[in-house]
Amino acid sequence: MAKVVQLPIIVTHNVKVVEHENVSYVRTRDIADALGVKQPFEFTSDIRETLGGQVVLNGEDTKDFRSGTDNARTPYVKVSDMIKFLEQGVINHRTNGTRKDVIAVLQSYMNTY
């Protein structure tokens, strides 16, 4: 008889937060990766549909704070808007189950900021 053992593997995702003019932003792709979302563009589309297109920034709106690895098409969202979106649970069915953990980390960051 074969012995089967389940090992809990915890993966850490580092999400870069950009501070610009006293506002905190995250890349939607980074949050999608942390949540295990396979289609980050669909994730960004969900944010637009849920909170409105104006909350997703790119192009001229991000030129003053995006990093050298980003381009004008890289979408950013305010951390506060990302928390709002995640709290609505719109994407529960497509995540790795870490939505509440991601919310907690973002809220903790905002409380210390």
Give names to the regions the model predicted.
Residues M1-K38, E42, K63-Y113:
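Positively charged, aromatic-accented nucleic-acid-binding surfaces
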Residues P40-L51:
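Major-groove recognition helix of helix-turn-helix-like DNA-binding domains
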Residues E49-K63:
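Short, basic alpha-helical nucleic acid-contact segments in DNA-binding proteins
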